[in-house]
Design a protein with these regions (language model features):
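Amphipathic, charge-rich alpha-helical segments that serve as recognition/docking helices
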Residues: 17-19, 60-138, 144, 155
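Short, charged/polar connector segments at secondary-structure boundaries
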Residues: 1-75
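Short, proline-centered helix/strand-breaking motifs
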Residues: 38-40, 137-140
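A short helix-loop-helix "switch/interaction" segment in the helical subdomain of ASCE P-loop NTPases
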Residues: 158-159
Length: 159
């Protein structure tokens, strides 16, 4: 169930994991202007913040429209479990392979999960996980910067 939350209360630490699509974002902005935000932003409750995982385009549109509140749905309090949940749904939601790779690298490096654990949790093969980890490892910093957006100045508001 979605609740209304203050836009400024969101921690955007994963914004740089998601690709920007300006044309799609412009269409979304127009839609939100006409009908409001129809699908809640999704995140995880990590004290003292709400960490946004899904809905960065909606977030940026809300900020452009100077909305004070947005609909928000919590994916729980366990950050690793929430990321795994987002990845499980990535076939139904449009996470690109690069976005998947960034989240999997986060699970491996920061959350200290190994490839077999990640594969098992996602019901995927170890090679599926390894391919995405390899993709992140092979990207130079310059290419990664061009493909993935720069973090917003508000990225770590509550950390």
């Amino acid at each position: 169930m979605a609740n209304e939350i203050e836009l400024g209360s969101l921690d955007l630490r994963y914004e740089s994991f998601r690709l920007k699509q300006p044309a799609l974002e412009e269409r979304l902005l127009s839609s939100i202007l006409q009908r409001g935000i129809e699908e809640p932003l999704e995140g995880v409750e990590v004290e003292p913040a709400r960490v946004l995982l899904n809905g960065f385009k909606r977030y940026r549109c809300a900020r452009k429209l100077r909305l004070a509140t947005v609909p928000y749905s919590s994916l729980g309090q366990d950050e690793a479990a929430a990321i795994l949940g987002l990845l499980k749904l990535s076939n139904h939601r449009t996470l690109s392979i690069l976005e998947q790779a960034a989240f999997i690298a986060e699970l491996k490096t920061v959350r200290r999960m190994n490839g077999a654990e990640i594969a098992s949790e996602l019901s995927r093969s170890k090679s599926w996980v390894t391919m995405r980890l390899g993709l992140m490892a092979e990207l130079s910093a310059g290419v990664r910067q061009q493909l993935l957006p720069e973090p917003s100045p508000f990225t770590r508001i509550c950390i």
